Amino acid sequence: MNTKEYKTFLSYCKASIDEKPLTISFDDFDDLSHSVFSNPHKIKQKASEIRKKFIDNIDENLLIFERKFTENGGKVHWCVSYDDFIDSLSALLAKNKIKAVNTFFSRFNTELGLEFSLKNEKIATLATDGKCAIFEPEFGIVNTGSLFSIFNSAYDMEIVMGSKLKIFIIPINKFVCNIAEIDIMSTLLSIYRNQNDSPFLSSIFTPNSHKDSASHVFLIDNGRSNILASKTHRKALWCIDCDACKRVCPVFNTIGDKPYNNVFTGPYANVVLPFYENFDSYKHLSFNSVGCGNCTRVCPVNIPLTDLMIENRRFFFEKKIMDLGDELLCSRLKKFLLSRREMNKKTWLKRRKIKVFIKSSVLKNRNTPAFAKQSFNGLKIQK
Protein backbone atom coordinates (compact mmCIF):
# COMPACT_ATOMS: atom_id res chain seq x y z
CA MET A 1 0.00 0.00 0.00
CA ASN A 2 1.93 2.92 -1.31
CA THR A 3 -0.80 5.48 -1.93
CA LYS A 4 -0.79 9.10 -0.80
CA GLU A 5 -3.91 8.46 1.29
CA TYR A 6 -2.25 5.56 3.10
CA LYS A 7 0.88 7.57 3.90
CA THR A 8 -1.23 10.45 5.24
CA PHE A 9 -3.31 8.01 7.27
CA LEU A 10 -0.16 6.48 8.81
CA SER A 11 1.35 9.85 9.71
CA TYR A 12 -1.78 10.91 11.61
CA CYS A 13 -2.04 7.49 13.28
CA LYS A 14 1.56 7.58 14.49
CA ALA A 15 1.04 11.02 16.02
CA SER A 16 -2.11 9.84 17.83
CA ILE A 17 -0.57 6.58 19.09
CA ASP A 18 2.32 8.50 20.65
CA GLU A 19 -0.18 10.51 22.71
CA LYS A 20 -2.25 7.73 24.33
CA PRO A 21 -2.16 3.96 24.87
CA LEU A 22 -4.33 1.43 23.06
CA THR A 23 -6.94 -0.45 25.11
CA ILE A 24 -9.55 -2.94 23.94
CA SER A 25 -11.78 -2.56 27.01
CA PHE A 26 -15.22 -1.02 26.67
CA ASP A 27 -16.63 -1.72 30.12
CA ASP A 28 -17.48 1.97 30.54
CA PHE A 29 -20.05 1.84 27.71
CA ASP A 30 -23.46 2.31 29.33
CA ASP A 31 -25.79 0.04 27.34
CA LEU A 32 -29.29 1.20 28.30
CA SER A 33 -30.89 -1.52 26.20
CA HIS A 34 -30.69 -3.91 29.16
CA SER A 35 -32.85 -1.60 31.27
CA VAL A 36 -35.28 -0.71 28.45
CA PHE A 37 -35.84 -4.20 27.01
CA SER A 38 -36.32 -7.46 28.88
CA ASN A 39 -34.46 -9.27 26.10
CA PRO A 40 -32.19 -6.81 24.21
CA HIS A 41 -30.58 -9.58 22.15
CA LYS A 42 -33.99 -10.53 20.76
CA ILE A 43 -34.74 -6.88 19.96
CA LYS A 44 -31.43 -6.53 18.13
CA GLN A 45 -32.22 -9.63 16.11
CA LYS A 46 -35.64 -8.20 15.25
CA ALA A 47 -34.03 -4.90 14.20
CA SER A 48 -31.53 -6.68 11.95
CA GLU A 49 -34.41 -8.57 10.31
CA ILE A 50 -36.22 -5.27 9.71
CA ARG A 51 -33.17 -3.78 8.03
CA LYS A 52 -32.45 -6.94 6.04
CA LYS A 53 -36.04 -7.07 4.77
CA PHE A 54 -35.72 -3.60 3.28
CA ILE A 55 -32.18 -3.88 1.90
CA ASP A 56 -32.72 -7.28 0.23
CA ASN A 57 -35.59 -5.78 -1.80
CA ILE A 58 -34.37 -2.20 -1.92
CA ASP A 59 -35.24 -1.50 -5.56
CA GLU A 60 -38.85 -2.65 -5.21
CA ASN A 61 -39.28 -0.93 -1.84
CA LEU A 62 -37.98 2.42 -3.09
CA LEU A 63 -40.37 2.33 -6.04
CA ILE A 64 -43.28 1.67 -3.66
CA PHE A 65 -42.17 4.61 -1.50
CA GLU A 66 -41.96 6.86 -4.57
CA ARG A 67 -45.48 5.90 -5.62
CA LYS A 68 -46.93 6.44 -2.13
CA PHE A 69 -45.10 9.74 -1.56
CA THR A 70 -46.23 11.02 -4.96
CA GLU A 71 -49.83 9.93 -4.32
CA ASN A 72 -49.70 11.90 -1.08
CA GLY A 73 -48.82 15.04 -3.02
CA GLY A 74 -45.03 15.05 -2.75
CA LYS A 75 -42.31 15.01 -5.38
CA VAL A 76 -39.47 12.45 -5.48
CA HIS A 77 -36.06 13.19 -7.00
CA TRP A 78 -33.56 10.39 -7.72
CA CYS A 79 -29.85 11.22 -7.48
CA VAL A 80 -26.95 8.88 -8.27
CA SER A 81 -24.21 11.11 -6.86
CA TYR A 82 -23.80 14.31 -4.88
CA ASP A 83 -23.24 16.17 -8.16
CA ASP A 84 -26.69 15.06 -9.36
CA PHE A 85 -28.16 16.16 -6.04
CA ILE A 86 -26.55 19.60 -6.08
CA ASP A 87 -27.64 20.20 -9.70
CA SER A 88 -31.24 19.12 -8.98
CA LEU A 89 -31.39 21.10 -5.74
CA SER A 90 -30.02 24.25 -7.39
CA ALA A 91 -32.63 23.97 -10.16
CA LEU A 92 -35.43 23.51 -7.61
CA LEU A 93 -34.33 26.51 -5.53
CA ALA A 94 -33.95 28.67 -8.65
CA LYS A 95 -37.40 27.66 -9.90
CA ASN A 96 -38.96 28.71 -6.58
CA LYS A 97 -36.80 31.87 -6.36
CA ILE A 98 -35.33 30.82 -3.03
CA LYS A 99 -32.45 33.00 -1.81
CA ALA A 100 -32.22 31.68 1.76
CA VAL A 101 -32.86 28.29 3.35
CA ASN A 102 -32.74 26.77 6.81
CA THR A 103 -30.34 23.83 7.03
CA PHE A 104 -29.63 21.50 9.92
CA PHE A 105 -26.37 19.74 10.65
CA SER A 106 -26.14 16.05 9.81
CA ARG A 107 -23.38 13.75 8.62
CA PHE A 108 -25.22 13.20 5.35
CA ASN A 109 -25.33 16.97 4.73
CA THR A 110 -21.57 17.02 5.24
CA GLU A 111 -21.10 14.02 2.94
CA LEU A 112 -22.98 15.87 0.19
CA GLY A 113 -21.15 19.16 0.76
CA LEU A 114 -24.51 20.91 1.13
CA GLU A 115 -23.38 24.03 3.01
CA PHE A 116 -20.43 24.60 0.65
CA SER A 117 -22.61 24.19 -2.45
CA LEU A 118 -25.28 26.58 -1.18
CA LYS A 119 -22.59 29.13 -0.41
CA ASN A 120 -21.27 28.82 -3.97
CA GLU A 121 -24.80 29.45 -5.25
CA LYS A 122 -24.96 32.54 -3.00
CA ILE A 123 -27.87 31.09 -1.04
CA ALA A 124 -27.94 32.00 2.66
CA THR A 125 -28.25 29.10 5.11
CA LEU A 126 -30.08 30.94 7.86
CA ALA A 127 -33.47 32.01 6.57
CA THR A 128 -35.94 34.13 8.53
CA ASP A 129 -38.86 34.13 6.10
CA GLY A 130 -39.93 30.49 6.69
CA LYS A 131 -40.03 29.75 2.98
CA CYS A 132 -37.66 26.79 2.72
CA ALA A 133 -36.03 24.18 4.96
CA ILE A 134 -33.67 21.34 4.02
CA PHE A 135 -33.69 18.46 6.48
CA GLU A 136 -32.53 14.83 6.74
CA PRO A 137 -35.16 12.50 8.25
CA GLU A 138 -34.02 9.41 10.16
CA PHE A 139 -36.10 6.93 8.16
CA GLY A 140 -38.41 6.80 5.19
CA ILE A 141 -41.50 4.60 5.62
CA VAL A 142 -42.23 2.58 2.49
CA ASN A 143 -45.85 1.49 2.92
CA THR A 144 -47.18 4.96 3.79
CA GLY A 145 -44.84 7.21 1.81
CA SER A 146 -44.00 9.04 5.03
CA LEU A 147 -40.82 10.33 6.68
CA PHE A 148 -39.82 9.83 10.31
CA SER A 149 -37.73 12.65 11.77
CA ILE A 150 -36.08 13.35 15.11
CA PHE A 151 -35.52 16.99 16.10
CA ASN A 152 -33.11 18.56 18.56
CA SER A 153 -35.67 21.13 19.70
CA ALA A 154 -39.26 22.25 19.24
CA TYR A 155 -37.89 25.30 17.43
CA ASP A 156 -36.20 23.12 14.81
CA MET A 157 -39.39 21.13 14.38
CA GLU A 158 -41.42 24.31 13.93
CA ILE A 159 -39.02 25.63 11.28
CA VAL A 160 -39.11 22.42 9.22
CA MET A 161 -42.81 21.71 9.49
CA GLY A 162 -43.77 25.35 9.04
CA SER A 163 -41.78 25.94 5.85
CA LYS A 164 -43.67 26.50 2.62
CA LEU A 165 -41.09 24.48 0.68
CA LYS A 166 -39.95 21.38 2.54
CA ILE A 167 -36.92 19.59 1.10
CA PHE A 168 -35.95 16.26 2.62
CA ILE A 169 -32.71 14.47 1.74
CA ILE A 170 -32.19 10.82 2.58
CA PRO A 171 -29.74 8.08 1.52
CA ILE A 172 -31.36 5.15 -0.28
CA ASN A 173 -30.66 2.69 2.56
CA LYS A 174 -32.37 4.57 5.42
CA PHE A 175 -35.89 3.16 5.14
CA VAL A 176 -38.18 0.72 6.91
CA CYS A 177 -40.92 -1.22 5.18
CA ASN A 178 -43.85 -0.26 7.40
CA ILE A 179 -44.79 2.22 10.09
CA ALA A 180 -45.01 -0.43 12.84
CA GLU A 181 -41.23 -0.93 12.63
CA ILE A 182 -40.49 2.67 13.57
CA ASP A 183 -41.02 2.02 17.29
CA ILE A 184 -38.15 -0.48 17.59
CA MET A 185 -35.80 1.37 15.25
CA SER A 186 -36.29 4.81 16.83
CA THR A 187 -35.84 3.43 20.35
CA LEU A 188 -32.62 1.62 19.43
CA LEU A 189 -31.36 4.72 17.63
CA SER A 190 -32.03 6.88 20.68
CA ILE A 191 -30.37 4.40 23.06
CA TYR A 192 -27.23 3.83 21.05
CA ARG A 193 -26.78 7.35 19.65
CA ASN A 194 -27.90 9.58 22.51
CA GLN A 195 -28.01 7.26 25.53
CA ASN A 196 -31.72 8.05 26.00
CA ASP A 197 -34.50 5.49 26.29
CA SER A 198 -36.67 7.29 23.72
CA PRO A 199 -36.34 10.05 21.08
CA PHE A 200 -36.53 13.58 22.49
CA LEU A 201 -38.87 14.99 19.85
CA SER A 202 -40.02 13.11 16.78
CA SER A 203 -42.55 13.41 13.99
CA ILE A 204 -43.97 11.35 11.13
CA PHE A 205 -44.52 13.56 8.11
CA THR A 206 -46.90 12.72 5.26
CA PRO A 207 -47.22 15.32 2.44
CA ASN A 208 -51.02 15.00 2.20
CA SER A 209 -51.40 16.44 5.70
CA HIS A 210 -49.66 19.66 4.64
CA LYS A 211 -51.55 20.76 1.53
CA ASP A 212 -50.55 24.40 1.99
CA SER A 213 -46.90 23.61 1.26
CA ALA A 214 -44.77 21.80 -1.32
CA SER A 215 -42.79 18.73 -0.28
CA HIS A 216 -39.79 17.26 -2.09
CA VAL A 217 -37.63 14.30 -1.13
CA PHE A 218 -34.25 13.51 -2.67
CA LEU A 219 -33.31 9.82 -2.67
CA ILE A 220 -29.54 9.77 -2.96
CA ASP A 221 -27.27 6.84 -3.77
CA ASN A 222 -23.78 8.39 -3.62
CA GLY A 223 -21.92 5.07 -3.78
CA ARG A 224 -24.24 2.91 -1.71
CA SER A 225 -25.37 0.75 -4.63
CA ASN A 226 -21.72 -0.28 -5.15
CA ILE A 227 -22.00 -2.50 -2.10
CA LEU A 228 -25.37 -4.08 -2.95
CA ALA A 229 -23.97 -6.63 -5.40
CA SER A 230 -22.40 -8.63 -2.58
CA LYS A 231 -24.89 -10.41 -0.32
CA THR A 232 -22.23 -10.44 2.39
CA HIS A 233 -21.17 -6.79 2.18
CA ARG A 234 -24.70 -5.40 1.79
CA LYS A 235 -25.20 -6.06 5.51
CA ALA A 236 -23.24 -2.84 6.06
CA LEU A 237 -26.23 -0.94 4.62
CA TRP A 238 -28.28 -1.98 7.65
CA CYS A 239 -26.47 0.81 9.55
CA ILE A 240 -28.70 3.36 11.34
CA ASP A 241 -25.91 5.91 12.01
CA CYS A 242 -25.86 5.56 15.80
CA ASP A 243 -22.02 5.64 16.06
CA ALA A 244 -22.00 3.09 18.89
CA CYS A 245 -19.23 1.16 17.09
CA LYS A 246 -16.94 4.19 17.33
CA ARG A 247 -17.32 4.52 21.08
CA VAL A 248 -16.14 0.95 21.71
CA CYS A 249 -13.43 0.75 19.04
CA PRO A 250 -9.91 0.78 20.56
CA VAL A 251 -8.35 1.89 17.27
CA PHE A 252 -10.78 4.77 16.70
CA ASN A 253 -10.48 5.91 20.32
CA THR A 254 -6.72 6.03 19.86
CA ILE A 255 -6.42 7.69 16.44
CA GLY A 256 -9.70 9.67 16.25
CA ASP A 257 -11.38 11.13 13.15
CA LYS A 258 -8.47 12.95 11.53
CA PRO A 259 -6.59 10.07 9.81
CA TYR A 260 -9.69 9.11 7.80
CA ASN A 261 -9.93 12.46 6.00
CA ASN A 262 -13.57 11.64 5.30
CA VAL A 263 -17.02 12.14 6.81
CA PHE A 264 -17.11 8.38 7.45
CA THR A 265 -14.87 7.26 10.31
CA GLY A 266 -14.48 4.32 12.67
CA PRO A 267 -15.23 0.61 12.06
CA TYR A 268 -18.08 1.35 9.65
CA ALA A 269 -15.76 3.42 7.45
CA ASN A 270 -13.25 0.56 7.44
CA VAL A 271 -15.89 -1.60 5.78
CA VAL A 272 -17.69 0.74 3.36
CA LEU A 273 -15.27 3.47 2.25
CA PRO A 274 -13.38 1.24 -0.23
CA PHE A 275 -16.75 0.67 -1.95
CA TYR A 276 -18.18 4.19 -1.55
CA GLU A 277 -15.02 5.90 -2.82
CA ASN A 278 -12.39 3.69 -4.49
CA PHE A 279 -10.40 0.61 -3.58
CA ASP A 280 -6.89 1.94 -4.15
CA SER A 281 -7.29 4.98 -1.89
CA TYR A 282 -9.17 3.30 0.96
CA LYS A 283 -8.37 -0.42 0.98
CA HIS A 284 -5.89 0.11 3.82
CA LEU A 285 -8.81 0.89 6.17
CA SER A 286 -9.92 -2.75 6.12
CA PHE A 287 -6.64 -3.59 7.90
CA ASN A 288 -7.24 -0.85 10.48
CA SER A 289 -8.53 -3.23 13.15
CA VAL A 290 -7.28 -5.32 16.07
CA GLY A 291 -10.09 -7.83 15.52
CA CYS A 292 -11.42 -7.45 19.08
CA GLY A 293 -15.06 -7.68 17.95
CA ASN A 294 -16.29 -4.81 20.15
CA CYS A 295 -18.03 -3.10 17.22
CA THR A 296 -19.89 -6.27 16.26
CA ARG A 297 -21.05 -6.93 19.83
CA VAL A 298 -22.41 -3.43 20.39
CA CYS A 299 -24.14 -2.88 17.01
CA PRO A 300 -27.92 -2.49 17.56
CA VAL A 301 -28.74 -4.10 14.21
CA ASN A 302 -26.17 -6.92 14.42
CA ILE A 303 -23.90 -5.84 11.57
CA PRO A 304 -20.88 -8.22 11.71
CA LEU A 305 -18.39 -5.39 11.21
CA THR A 306 -15.32 -7.38 12.25
CA ASP A 307 -16.20 -10.20 9.85
CA LEU A 308 -16.84 -7.70 7.05
CA MET A 309 -13.39 -6.15 7.49
CA ILE A 310 -11.88 -9.62 7.17
CA GLU A 311 -14.12 -10.31 4.16
CA ASN A 312 -12.83 -7.09 2.58
CA ARG A 313 -9.26 -8.34 2.90
CA ARG A 314 -10.20 -11.64 1.25
CA PHE A 315 -12.04 -9.75 -1.50
CA PHE A 316 -9.03 -7.51 -2.21
CA PHE A 317 -6.71 -10.52 -2.37
CA GLU A 318 -8.96 -12.58 -4.66
CA LYS A 319 -9.67 -9.65 -6.99
CA LYS A 320 -5.94 -8.78 -7.07
CA ILE A 321 -6.61 -5.30 -5.72
CA MET A 322 -3.66 -5.67 -3.32
CA ASP A 323 -0.33 -4.00 -4.10
CA LEU A 324 2.14 -6.40 -5.71
CA GLY A 325 4.36 -6.58 -2.62
CA ASP A 326 1.42 -7.29 -0.30
CA GLU A 327 0.00 -9.83 -2.74
CA LEU A 328 3.29 -11.74 -2.91
CA LEU A 329 3.61 -11.67 0.88
CA CYS A 330 0.08 -13.01 1.37
CA SER A 331 0.65 -15.75 -1.21
CA ARG A 332 3.89 -16.87 0.43
CA LEU A 333 2.39 -16.80 3.92
CA LYS A 334 -0.68 -18.73 2.76
CA LYS A 335 1.47 -21.40 1.13
CA PHE A 336 3.67 -21.63 4.24
CA LEU A 337 0.85 -21.77 6.81
CA LEU A 338 -1.18 -24.34 4.84
CA SER A 339 1.78 -26.66 4.32
CA ARG A 340 1.60 -29.69 6.60
CA ARG A 341 5.29 -30.32 6.04
CA GLU A 342 6.18 -26.81 7.21
CA MET A 343 3.79 -26.82 10.16
CA ASN A 344 5.25 -30.10 11.45
CA LYS A 345 8.70 -28.56 11.74
CA LYS A 346 10.15 -27.36 15.04
CA THR A 347 8.70 -24.18 16.57
CA TRP A 348 11.93 -22.17 16.42
CA LEU A 349 12.32 -22.94 12.73
CA LYS A 350 8.77 -21.83 11.91
CA ARG A 351 9.30 -18.65 13.92
CA ARG A 352 12.49 -17.87 12.01
CA LYS A 353 10.74 -18.33 8.65
CA ILE A 354 7.98 -15.94 9.72
CA LYS A 355 10.64 -13.33 10.49
CA VAL A 356 12.03 -13.81 6.99
CA PHE A 357 8.58 -13.33 5.41
CA ILE A 358 7.64 -10.28 7.47
CA LYS A 359 9.89 -7.24 7.26
CA SER A 360 11.85 -6.31 10.37
CA SER A 361 10.21 -2.85 10.35
CA VAL A 362 6.83 -4.48 10.97
CA LEU A 363 8.19 -6.40 13.95
CA LYS A 364 10.01 -3.41 15.43
CA ASN A 365 7.30 -2.59 17.99
CA ARG A 366 5.63 -6.00 18.34
CA ASN A 367 6.50 -9.61 19.03
CA THR A 368 6.85 -12.22 16.32
CA PRO A 369 3.68 -14.38 16.21
CA ALA A 370 4.23 -17.44 18.39
CA PHE A 371 3.53 -21.02 17.34
CA ALA A 372 2.31 -23.70 19.74
CA LYS A 373 4.96 -26.18 20.82
CA GLN A 374 3.05 -28.93 19.09
CA SER A 375 0.54 -28.89 16.22
CA PHE A 376 -2.83 -30.66 16.29
CA ASN A 377 -1.44 -33.03 13.70
CA GLY A 378 1.46 -33.89 16.00
CA LEU A 379 -0.87 -34.50 18.94
CA LYS A 380 -3.03 -36.80 16.81
CA ILE A 381 0.00 -38.83 15.71
CA GLN A 382 1.09 -39.24 19.35
CA LYS A 383 -2.31 -40.65 20.30
Regions found by a protein language model. Name each.
Residues 1-232:
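The feature marks the mature, well-folded catalytic cores of soluble enzymes
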Residues 2-30, 311, 325-383:
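Intrinsic disorder at enzyme termini
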Residues 81, 245, 304-305:
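Helix N-cap / loop-to-helix initiation motif
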Residues 209-236, 252-359:
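Ferredoxin-type iron-sulfur electron-transfer modules in oxidoreductases and energy-metabolism complexes
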